[in-house]
Amino acid sequence: MPWVEPKPRPGPEQKPKLTKPDSATGPQWYQESQESESEGKQPPPGPLAPPKSPEPSGPLASEQDAPLPEGDDAPPRPSMLDDAPRLPLELDDAPLPEEETPEPTAICRHRHRCHTDCLEGLLSRTFQWLGWQVGAHPWIFLLAPLMLTAALGTGFLYLPKDEEEDLEEHYTPVGSPAKAERRFVQGHFTTNDSYRFSASRRSTEANFVSLLVVSYSDSLLDPATFAEVSKLDGAVQDLRVAREKGSQIQYQQVCARYRALCVPPNPILYAWQVNKTLNLSSISFPAYNHGRHPLYLTGFFGGYILGGSLGMGQLLLRAKAMRLLYYLKTEDPEYDVQSKQWLTHLLDQFTNIKNILALKKIEVVHFTSLSRQLEFEATSVTVIPVFHLAYILIILFAVTSCFRFDCIRNKMCVAAFGVISAFLAVVSGFGLLLHIGVPFVIIVANSPFLILGVGVDDMFIMISAWHKTNLADDIRERMSNVYSKAAVSITITTITNILALYTGIMSSFRSVQCFCIYTGMTLLFCYFYNITCFGAFMALDGKREVVCLCWLKKADPKWPSFKKFCCFPFGSVPDEHGTDIHPISLFFRDYFGPFLTRSESKYFVVFIYVLYIISSIYGCFHVQEGLDLRNLASDDSYITPYFNVEENYFSDYGPRVMVIVTKKVDYWDKDVRQKLENCTKIFEKNVYVDKNLTEFWLDAYVQYLKGNSQDPNEKNTFMNNIPDFLSNFPNFQHDINISSSNEIISSRGFIQTTDVSSSAKKKILLFQLRRIAEDCQIPLMVYNQAFIYFDQYAAILEDTVRNVLVASAAMFIVSLLLIPYPLCSLWVTFAIGSVIVGVTGFMAFWKVNLDSISMINLVICIGFSFDFSVHISYAFVSSSQPSVNQKSVEALYLLGYPVLQSAISTIIGVCVLAAAKAYIFRTFFKIMFLVMIFGAAHGLIFIPVFLTFFGRFI
C-alpha cells in the first residue's frame, strides 16, 4: 500500500477541528494547503529517475480550489481520492495543520534505509510516466490490447466440448490415501465381470443402473407389489439399443455375470421370480440363507421393520423400499463402450418406460454410473442466461454511478467501456490458459462474475482520479496525474487479491487449483487493461471534454438547447478547478460518522459484534464438510429425488470395506492367526461396523481343514489344500493372491459398515478404520471405492485452514511492508480473521457445506477483507485530527463511500448467481454475499469503533 509521510501532530496551540469554517465551501474545507499550477508541459521523468525538488509555485498558486498539477520536475505527490468508489489510498485532502508538511521524497533521501514511502514514490513515478505515455499515444494503448485479446481469444477453440470432466480427478484430493490403496488392490487382486462378478470386490466403480422402488403402501413384501416390480425389471432387461447395420445391444450381452447368469438386480426378487410360492413373510435380514447360499441383503431393502431372530438375521416384517441394481461389464474396453451406450439409451427411454407400464403400486427413481457426470456437465448450461444478465446489471450500475448532470464531466460511456474492459480481460485470461492447456473445470464459470465486480471497482478509482484533475490542463498531464494517484491504489489491491488467490494453488483439489489459476490470471489482465486500453479510452474522452470546453466560454442564447445541455448543463459554465465531492461522502462525514462515534452507539456496536462472533463460532462447529454428490447436479435433475429416497430409506448400511493383509505372513502359524483374529474383533467392536456380517476366507478355510481332519497349523497341509477349498467356495477365489512359488502374497476379508449417512460420520469412520489397521500387529489396509470420495472430508478442513493461514500471513506481511504502522497491520489481520470466522459460521446457517467450492470463496474472502479494513485503518492512524472520534469520522468521510460502493458492485456482479439452478453457482453467490456484507460491516462499523478504543496507543 502506498504510504505518505504522517502529518505532524497538532500541538497545544494548534488543534484543527473537524468543523467547516463559515466561509469555506465543501471542497475548500479539505484543501487548506496552497495549490499551484504547473508551468511546463514536458513529460515527467522516467520511472527510475530520482525525484527532483519542486519548482516554485506558479501564478495560480493562490487559487484555493485548484488541484496541484504535476510540473516538469515536480515529484509526484500523493493525493486523496475523495469519492473513489474503491479503496483510494492517498490522504492529502484531509485537514492539515498550518505548518508545512515536509515532502515524503525529501525525507526518504535523508534516511539511511529505504522505507515504504520510497516504494510508494517509485510506483507513483512509474505510473506518472506511464500515464503521460497513455495520454500522448491513446490509440496505441487502446488498439494494442484489443489486438492482443483477439489473438488470445483463439484459445477458446481449445475449450473442451465433448470431453468429459473427470469428477474424481478434479473434486477429490490429489494423492489421497484411498488412491494409493486402490493402486495396491488393483495390483494384487483380480476381478472377472464376465463370470464371477462381485461388486464389493471391485476396486473401481462398475457400470450400473440403480432403481429405487418405493411402495405406496406400508410394505412391498406382497405378491401383487412384487409382480409390478417384476414387470419393471422385465422392461429394463428387454431394452435394446439399435446400432448400425441393423445390429442391437441387448442387456444380456453387456450384463455382468455370475457363472452363466446375469447378476440378479435383487436377490429376493430373483428368488421369487424363480419360485412364485416363496414366502415373503419369512425372509431374514440382513442375511438370508437361500439353498445353503447366504445372501447379503444390506442395501437391497430400506424402510424396514424387523422382528425376532431368524436364521442368519432377524425376521423382515415390513419393507417400504427396494433397490434393483443392474451391473454391466466394465473391464473389457469394447464391452465398456457398449455398456455405456446401453446406459445412455436407458436414460433417454426411462420416462417412456414408466409411462407405458403405468405403475400403480410403486414409485420409481433411477440413477446410473453415468448420471453424476452427465448431470454435472449439464449445470454449466444453467448459468449462461444469468451471465448476460450480470453484464447488463453491471453496465447499468456503472453508468448510473458515473452519471453527472455536468455533461462535460459525464463518464457514462467511459463506465460502459470499463465493463467491456473487464470482459476483454476474461477473454484474454481464459484464452491464454486454454492455449497453455490448463484444464477448464465447471466452477471456473464463476470467475467472470467476480472479475466483473473487481474490474468495475478499479475503473471507478481511475474515473474518480480523473475528476480531480484540472479541465484546462493538457491531456497528457491529466493522465499523468490520474495514474500517479489511482494506479498505485489499484496495483496494491490487485497484488493482495492475486496473492490471496494464488495461495489456493497449494490446495490438494484440482478444481480449486484451476479456479485460482484462471481467476488470478484474469485479474492480472483486468489490471493490465485498466491501465492501458481503459486509460486510453478515458484520454480520448478527455479530448472530448477539451473540445467541448473550448467551444464555449459563455452560453449564447442563440445556440440550440441540446448544444447548451451537452456542454453547459442548465446554461452554466463548468468550473475548471472544482472538485467533486459525492453526497454520500458528505453523509458519512456529517451524519453517519458522528452518530457512530457517540458513546451509546459504540456500546451497541460492541454488543452487536459480540453476538456476531458468538453466533459465528457456534456455526463453525456445525458446518458440514465435504461435497454432497447430489449438489453436483441442477435442482430439477432426476438424480436429486434419487438421492433423497436413498437418504430416507437406505442410510442404515454403508459400504462393505475390504480388510487387506498387505504382506506375506505365516497364516498356518496359530499366533499369527490369533493376532489377525484380535484385529478383526477390534474392527467389529467399532460403532460403525456390524459384527454379524464379517466375511473372511481364513476363518472358513480353518473350519474347512478341521472338518476334513486336517491340521491348519502345518504349512504344507495349509498351502496344499487351498485349491480344493477355493473350488468348493468359489466366492473366495479373488480374495487370495498366491504367487507362482506357492506363497500367499496378500489376502483380504470384508466388514460391513453401518450408519454413516452424514459427512461427519464418514470422516470418523475412515479415520478410525485406518487407525485400527495401523495399530494392528499384522500389516493391514482398509479400502472401499467410496473412500476415494470420503477422503475429501478429511482433506477439506486441513486444506482450508492451511490456505487461510498462509494467505492471512501473506496479507500481514504485505501490510507491514506497505504501511508504516504495525498496529494498523494487526487490525487488518484481526479483521481478516473475524470475517473468515463469520463467513464460515454463517455457512452452516445458510446450509452451505465446507467443500472445494466454498474453500475457493474463503480464500477470496481474505483479499476482500484486506481491502476493506486496511484503508480505513490506515486513514485513521494517519489522520491529524486531535481526537480519536474525529479520526474515525475523517476515515469514514474519505473512504466510507468507496468501501460501500466496492461491496455493492461485487454483490451486483454475483447476485445473478442466486437465480442459478445449480448448487455450485448458488454457493458462490451466498459466500461472496457474506464476504461483502461482513467485510463492509467491519470496514464501516466495527473497525472505526474499535479504533477509537485503542487510538490513544497509536
Swiss-Prot record:
Membrane topology according to the record: Multi-pass membrane protein
Q: What residues are glycosylation sites in this protein?
A: N192, N275, N279, N678, N692, N737
Q: Which Pfam families match?
A: Patched
Q: Where are the transmembrane segments?
A: 139-159, 297-317, 383-403, 423-443, 447-467, 486-506, 520-540, 603-623, 804-824, 826-846, 858-878, 894-914, 927-947
**Keyword line:** Cell membrane, Cell projection, Cilium, Endoplasmic reticulum, Flagellum, Glycoprotein, Membrane, Transmembrane, Transmembrane helix
Which compartments is it annotated to reside in?
Cell projection, Cilium, Flagellum membrane; Endoplasmic reticulum membrane
Gene Ontology cellular-component terms listed: endoplasmic reticulum; endoplasmic reticulum membrane; membrane; plasma membrane; sperm midpiece
Q: Where is the SSD domain?
A: 383-540
InterPro entries per record: Patched_domain-protein (IPR051697), PTHD_SSD (IPR003392), SSD (IPR000731)
Bias regions of kind Pro residues — which residues? 42-57
Keyword Electron transport assigned to the entry: answer is: no
Task: Reply yes or no: does the keyword Zinc-finger apply.
Answer: no
Bias class Acidic residues marks the residues at 90-102
Q: Where is this region: Disordered?
A: 1-103
Expressed in which tissues:
Expressed in germ cells of the testis (at protein level). Detected in blood lymph, colon, small intestine, ovary, testis, prostate, thymus and spleen with highest levels in testis.
Q: Where is the composition biased (Basic and acidic residues)?
A: 1-20
Q: What does this protein do?
A: May play a role in sperm development or sperm function. However, does not appear to have an essential role in spermatogenesis or male fertility.
| Family label | Belongs to the patched family.
Q: What is this protein called?
A: Patched domain-containing protein 3
- Give the source species: Homo sapiens (Human)
Instruction: Give the gene symbol.
Output: PTCHD3
